[in-house]
Amino acid sequence: MEPRDLSAHVAYEAGRGVEEVARDLGLDPESLVKLSSNENAYGPAPKAAEAIREYAPNVHTYPKSSAADLREALAEQWAVTPSQVWLANGGDGALDYLARAMLDPGDGVLVSKPGFAYYAMSARYHHGTVSEYPIRKSEDFEQTAEAVLQHYDGERIVYVTSPHNPSGSEMSLSEVEKLADETDEETLVVVDEAYGEFSDSPSAVALVEERDDVAVLRTFSKAYGLAGVRLGYAVVPGEWADAYARVNTPFAASEIACRAGLAALDDPDHVEKTVEGARWARQYMYDELDCHTWESSGNFVLCEVGEGTAVAEAAQREGVIVRDTTSFGLPECIRVTCGTREETERAVEVLNELV
């Protein structure tokens, strides 16, 4: 017996963990600085960590009330109804729910290149076909509706990442609205705002109230520091919000995840500290790195270093783990997550010795 043909599928390439790298290099994990996975340099929201400890004895129960409470809290934050908040086990889980709700076998999706690999992965899991539109380095990764529409051919879902990973560029709210206006009525524009808290631009959630063809993805992984908990959500139009009951994996957002999410929402000081820290780190890298960088609205900076793989491997040997962006189709670049001041300064010092 064999699985179905998976030849069109590609494996997701995550950044390597500290323990894994330390074992390979024979180093103390405590001596390494990991700036490769866009994790929160300041850790989880303290109130969330406290909630995880407090509710650990309750993990034998299903997250019925906590999930409902979290949907209500998020609905209040975004001025939508609880039914419009689709909780999931991470942003990728929310992508799967949207694919389940929207895609019939053979339906097409349009994804950016470079971009988040899971958009295409999720579509293919649900028997969709995948086309791409370019976000070009030669154009400083500018994102416009027109650039997407040049490659649009009636796809059922169009994915926009704003801020974009790995470049940090954004698509403005007016451009998202233009894209939704000029695609077919049955095309859904999904705006992935995983890094939205780090941006000064308004969220595309503002469009959800007035239209039925835009959905927005958000996560607790980045600004809230809960990547290991796996908690994300989509905000969808009210017209088809009730589809959630028919497409969601039961209890996929765990009791611990929901309790942590509720507590994190009640800890705005941590988000503010995280965002301000990222803003400082971005500027420090722009000013101090001896290589070309692109302005970013995320918690990371894309750097052109010549040979991304060689520089990333050399930095790793010096105890600084950064992301080689070859898998994004940018072999001449690396991506550096915003660390604490000490981490960022060390990374810049090491990288400047290598470029």
Model-derived features: positions:
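Conserved PLP-binding catalytic core of the aspartate aminotransferase-like
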Residues: 279, 283-318
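Active-site phosphate-binding strand-loop segment of PLP-dependent enzymes
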Residues: 136-193, 197-199
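Conserved beta-loop-alpha segment that forms the PLP phosphate-binding cup at the N-terminus of a helix
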Residues: 68-71, 83-109, 232
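PLP-dependent enzyme catalytic core of the Aspartate aminotransferase-like
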Residues: 1, 174, 317, 330-355
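PLP-dependent aminotransferase class I/II
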Residues: 214-288, 292-294
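PLP-dependent aminotransferase-like
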Residues: 101-155
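N-terminal "arm"/small-domain region of PLP-dependent enzymes with the aminotransferase-like
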Residues: 1-61, 146, 153-154, 234
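Conserved N-terminal alpha-helix of the aminotransferase class I/II PLP-enzyme fold
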Residues: 50-89, 281-284
